[in-house]
C-alpha cells in the first residue's frame, strides 16, 4: 500500500498545473520516517517497512566527520521500477558532536563553490561523505534516476547542501531534484540561500511548532521590519545566517489533519508570519527540545 502510494505521489504530485512545486504531507511523513531510520546502523528494516516493493538499500556510509572523530552517516535507498534514489542523512548523534557543531557554527563561514558562504561544520561534514555519494551520481546506469534528499536536524542541513552541490555540478536538473527536511538549522548566508532557491526550487523545510533548531545559528536582524515585536532577518548580503525557502510550519501539532502553513511571505525563506514570529523564552526550553525531537508524532532520533 505504501509503495503504491509513494509511486502515485512522485508521478502525479511533483508540480501543480501552474508549474509550482507542491508540498505533500503524506510524502513528508514517509520521508520523516526514513530520516529517523538514518539513526540506525541497519536501515534496511526501515526501508522494508516504509517502502515495500522493489525499494532496497543501495549504500550506507558512516565516517568520522570532524576534529573530534564524531561520525556522520547517510544511506541511499533505490527503486529501479520508479528510477529513483532517496538519499537520507543522519542528524546529530551525540552531545559531544553537538558541541562541535555549535562551536563551528559560531565561527566564520566558508565559500561554497561560488554560491555563497556555508556553515563550515556542515560543509566539512558533507565533504567527508561525498566521496561515497559522488560515484552513484556519476554512474551512467542511474543517469535517469531522480533524487530526493532528506534528513532531520544536522541531516537536513547536509541534505540541503548536498542538493545544492548536485545542482551546481549539473548531476541533475531542478525537475529531478527534491529536498524535504525536518528541523533543519540555517546552513549558510543570504547569498547561499538565494543561490539555493534558484537551483533547488523543489524544496521544503518542515518545522514543528516551537522547534528551536531552525532558528539557529541566529540571523542578523532588520530593525525596520518588525512583526508583533519581533524583528525580521535582514536581507543584507552580509547576513551570515539565512534560510532558503520554503518553510512548512505546523504551529499546533502534527497529527493527520492538523494545520500547516506554506511560508512564502517576506522575507523569502524567513517568513515573519511563520515560526520566526515566535518569542523564545528560557522557561520553555524543554518544549523547544521536544518539538525538535518529535516530528509527525514519532521520535526523529
Residue positions per predicted region:
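Short, well-ordered alpha-helical microsegments
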Residues: 95, 159, 188-189
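Serine hydrolase/lipase
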Residues: 2-4, 8-21, 81-84, 125-150, ...
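Short, glycine/serine-rich, charged loops/turns that create anion-binding
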Residues: 92-93, 154, 186
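Intrinsic-disorder-associated interaction segments
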Residues: 20-27, 91, 115, 122, ...
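A conserved cap/lid and substrate-binding interface adjacent to the catalytic center
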Residues: 52-150, 168-176, 199-201
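Gly/Ala-rich beta-loop-alpha elbow adjacent to hydrolase catalytic centers
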Residues: 151-155, 159
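Exposed alpha-helical structural elements
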Residues: 26-30, 46, 97, 117, ...
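Signal-peptide-cleavage-adjacent N-terminal segments of secreted and extracellular proteins
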Residues: 13-81
